[in-house]
Amino acid sequence: MYNKNVAITGSTIEKTTKYDQFREDKIRMELYRIILPLYNEGYRTFTCNPHSYIGLLGADTIIMLREADKCPDITLSAIIPGTTFPADTDKVYRALYDDLMKQADNKEMLPEKEIFSNVLTGSHIVCYYDDFSEEIGQVRASGIPYTNIRKMI
């Protein structure tokens, strides 16, 4: 009952928020509202792609819930692509990424092309994709329950 897992992934920051702080706050609130009930339903391992913006915010939310003792035995698993962040990545997000990688319970490097297929092995998917994107089409076709945060904000 307590070994179910959730994959959190989605678009880049440019496609997600365009660096809009208000939109980022709304995404964080939705992640909190989604992750806490999933944890209470028995999901314990949350796998994030921190190179996707939603994965980075999801990882941060997971750590916050763990530190607040709301989800004491939640596990953060980070899937890291072989590519590095672009040189122009915002320094705040880069620092957040570095901090979260130190706190991740598990880390696995995968080639960029394998990351999305790894997402499709979860018991639930939390994502941020445009309704007409190829990725959301694959999520729908997988039959795995999913929550697309883009529809909530």
Regions found by a protein language model. Name each.
Residues 1-153:
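Acidic/glycine-enriched connector segments
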